[in-house]
Amino acid sequence: MITSNNNNKNNNKKDVEMKSNEEEGDEIFFSILSGDTNNLFKFLNNNNSNNNNNNNNNNINNSIDIYLPYIIVGILEKNKDLLDEDENLKKLFYSPIYSKSIHNINQYQSLNFDHINEFIKDQVRIRKKLNHVNQDKKDTYLDNIDNPKYQFENGDKEVKMKLVLSDIIALLEFSEMQQSLTISKETKYDAPFIDTPIYNNELNLIFPIICYKCLKHIDFNKLTLSILFLNQANYLIKLLLSNNPNEFNEIIEIVISSIGLIGVEKVKRVLLEICKLSKYCSRFIRTELINRQMLPDLVLLITSQFVKDEIDLLSNIISNRIENQWLKEYISQKDQFSTFNEIRDSLFSTLELISKEISSNSNNNSNNLEHSFIVKSIIRLYCGFSGLLGIKMNQQEISISLSFIEKSIFKNYSKIFLCFLLVCEGLVKTIHPKKELVGYLNHLCKVGNCDELLLLISIYFHTHQLQNIALLVKNILGFRPSIHTESLNQIGEILTKEIYTESLVAKRAQQLPIIEKLNTNHQNISIVCVYHLLSERIFEKYETDVGNWCWSQLTKSSTPIHYLLPSLLDQLCKNIIEPSINNNNTSSTTSIINTSTTAAAASTTASNANTTAATTTTTTAATITTATTTGTTTGISPSSSTTTTSSTGGATSTSISSPNSTSLGNSYLFSTFSSTSSSSSSGLPFYMKRISESIIMNSIQQSQSNLSVQILIIYFVLRYNDSVIKFKSEQKGKPIQFLIETTQLREYNIEFLSKLPIQNCINVILSNQSDYFYIIPPFLYLILSQFPQFFNINLLLLEEERLLNPIEKFIYLPNFYSINGGANNNSGGITNEFLKDTLKRTLSQPTSVQLILRYLNTLSVKELLPFTTTLLDNLLPIIIKNRSLPSVSALISPFVEIWERVFPISQSSIALKTINILTCINDDKSTNNNKDLEDYNNNNNNNNDDVKMKDKEKEDKEEEEEEEILLPISNYTYTDIISDPLVIFRSHPTVFTCPPLFKILLQILFFYMVSSKKNLQNQLHTSSGSGSGTTSNVTLNKQQQEDVSTLILTQESTIIQILLEICLIDGIDTKGLNKILRNKNKKFKESYDPVDIEEIRCQICSFIHQMFIDKPLIIKLVHFQGYLSQLLPITVTLIPSMHICFEFIPELLAQPSLEKQIFAIQLLSYLSEKFPIPKSLKICRQSQTRISFNLNSNTLSYDDRIKFLHSILPSITRITKTFPLLAEDFVSILMEQLPNKHNYQQNLKSFISSIDFNLNSNLNNYTNSIYLQNNKNNNNSSNNNNSNNQNDLLNIDIDNNINSNNNNNLRNINFKKVSNDDKSFFSKVSKNESWLSIKENNDPFNIPIEQEIHQAIQIIIKNLSK
């Protein structure tokens, strides 16, 4: 025993000595490669001192002898002063150990290398000459010496040098012949000196000196390649590298690329010998081989013997599968296990050694930490062996790996061990009994951070999502292993039956921790578990409500949004709305529902009759609204709550949509549902609780500082409503239980949604897209599908134009706001209190308000938004009431600019606030409460009391009633306005005469139009879909869809009709808005000018044009309804899309209604004038046929025929001027209506044949004189005509220069005698007068039709002569 111990000690000492020698060699070569001469000399000197004490280190001496030529020739020759400067080098140089070698080197160095180089040159020339003549080589230096080996052993240094050079020159010639294939590869060169090991000591000195002194005639690369053909190439290449560190890369490159010349095995031996120089060489060679993807066995051998980083190399192979596929394929070959098995044995030995050390040294924390990391890395490699390399682990490796699971120091790596259990093939068959495997899994549940991971894996097993298990293992290991399906199923069976049953999983998920500030950077498993359980409906199966957990996690989230949160909320909505599991006891379910329905019937029977009547009224509303196209504005009265009527088959139910009010029947149903939902014996399907409105609002208020929570809450609400709409749409005609419909399928009402900060959330996610990347697409879809009014393209374009406007950068910033604002605010900015006080003094201090508005306009939208409510409440009423004052009128433009900037950010709240202000303003006595306004009126109106008395005397009862009806003082809600957008037209009349304010009104109108349309569509989808599925029920659903479409069209057409009426607010005396305006603005009757009205017309026509483009069908509906003919010049001129009317004018001409035919002809005449194209000519010919048919047939009565002629004569003159080709046919039609048409035709032919045509001077003078006389009598009536509604096509220019010849032709026309009463007719036909003015100011039935026909023919002919 003592002897064996001594032997072990000796062996250990030898191993230590070998390791120290290797380390010393590494230090020397690394110092040479790095050029660190100080460290090199220091190390050699230390080694020299050690050698003096121990003379047995011959290996060290030999290794150092290799580097001596480099030190003496390569270093000292270049820097001779280094010997005197460096003490370490001086000691080394004068050391007795190296004195002989140094002396020999100096002798070789002292040779005359000029003669040596000439010798080389001569020998090369001789060999080339002999090779050329193919003679035996008898003239070389080596051939002429007898017994050359004796000469080498006993000769002087020059002879030895020449002999070695002769040997090298011959070797170079042999190498060239081998490369050129002039000799066989099997031919060997027998080098007498350089390939003889006994001469290596001398070669150690000669070879480096040849490389330093003789490279002029010997190529270094060729020399390196030729050495590889020798038997001791390993040693000579090593010698070259030791003395030529600068050529390291080139030498390695030559060796690796010479496989084809010298063979694979020889290259391996050379490279292994080079690896002995240092670890740097071995790492470099391995890197080169891996990059070239060659010699995989050598790569593994270098790793195990020299580099010794097996774990890192194999990890790289497993992780980078594509790049290291060649290595993977080599390892997977069963016949190549010899090299790889060494690495496996090394890994197994490492695990055994660590296991023993842990057992003996359990208290050494530093070693334990290192050991735990090594074990974790090896276990990860074992997962890769079985999963990627196809290597089945043996029982010893499995056992030693599992033995670390229960070690306390490995608790942080429990996930790696879990992956090992899942990946290891044949694990269940290897471990007996199975209870041990169950124990390992239970231990992983209790220790470490593997509990939630095991729960998630068990969920995947329960839901048969094996691919997700592989993905989970990939995320833990860093690579995707190929898991054996059979082995994985065996583990899954144990996990799901012994540890995590399905019911336990459902209950355990409720207890999962809620992560604070959950975002996408958290690798949280809880949300993944809940998501998969929701998607597979396991919670529903075991009646587990996880809604509270989801809502709590939602309120704890932050940015960037976790990628699973939107999907989690989607699944939660689906589980709340669409339960899929029903109990078999359907009879008990039916009885409970019948009981609930009976209890609720008592509270709803009384309202059913009223609801039925309301439904009938709603059905006929479209017809009533269609008939009312002009004149009045209809609306609804605002109320605190909105009543929603829904119809289910033949039954009708009424429910209050206010979130705080619930009917008695519904409360009974809710209590019944809550009392029976938890009982499995009740037979009711399980439902998760719907999140109430109060919880949602409280969460939003509590998360004012966390916008991500608000966005997620709004996303949930919108997703819930969207799911309800889709579910009810899919269930159309299918039976739905009444209890389900009244509890689960209750969408959040529109009034509640209007209070949510949806618009702000849109701005937030669009400005921070990276933080909300996973929620942006579904969130924008939900908003677009439910609130399309928030995506107004016009507002976006205006905002973009404003941002790109360079003039905005030069806005003057006054100092007023900072001086006055600083009095009330320490920060120097404006507060709402200061702004409110200043706005109250607007009439007395308009300049202050002007400066403040200019300052506010320089703020960003985010900074400007808090002042919006103050501006609207205090400034807008003053602007409306005192718009005629120049000081107030100047404030409109900056106010509107601010309004337009903040409106896209908060459309719903700003629109509602603005409309409530505009509809609640009362001009009578509201201004008396304002002290500043009262002072202003007293200073500027001395007779204010007298004016008020006169105004009161002029008011009558009818006007007071109209004021009460049209301007109610109320507070409209969002639901009120979207139910009837016409409420917007109840705004103060000042808005309709002020272009900036009217522009605001149009934006609000568009917002509520889109909202109303979407609300009607949603009501259609969310209306009760229960029923028996009969044909009559399907027909009823189709009828409801048609009714909603008709209602939307009718609503939009009514809005267009009212807007068109506004265009004539100063043109005609209507009973509509013009009358309202005049009644309400008696104080400021001339408060607007035609320029404002023209601008408003342009705004209206642009708005209508956009509606026509969005829905071309509406243009047909509006024109089939018809409007005043005075609007045609305005619509045709200012609405570019009016050309669409060409498509349906023929259909309009074919209508049986005479009014529609007249309107079609009038519309066609204006369109033809603007669009003189072939298509309009074709339609004009069709209208000509219709006119001829109406006038020449007996279809019309005499009165209708006269009415028809009076209406279309101006249009005929307009058409004939546009298309002269139709003039003759139209003149013929008109002449057919004259009693003396034959005589008229004869005179007309001679009249047309004349070259110049002028009217008779007598007739001209006569008519002009009468016109002047009548113009005085009818001054008021003629001046009221709007010049914008006239058309120059009808103007008659009577020339004063009359040709006598033409006068004779004109006198021959036999006109009917004109009475004095009818002479006024001719007075109207003069310059700048038209048929339209004649028609307006004269009763057409009092004018003989023959006179009008005569005049029309004159106009046609006049137009032809131009």
UniProtKB/Swiss-Prot annotation:
Ranges annotated as biased composition (Low complexity): 1-10
GO biological process: RNA polymerase II transcription initiation surveillance; snRNA 3'-end processing
Gene: ints2
Protein name stated in the entry: Integrator complex subunit 2 homolog
GO (cellular component) term, any one: cytoplasm
Region (Disordered): 1-20, 629-660, 928-963
Key words, A-Z: Cytoplasm, Nucleus
Subcellular localization: Nucleus; Cytoplasm
Oligomer and partners: Component of the Integrator complex. The core complex associates with protein phosphatase 2A subunits, to form the Integrator-PP2A (INTAC) complex.
Nucleus as UniProt keyword: yes
Pfam families registered for this protein in UniProt: INTS2
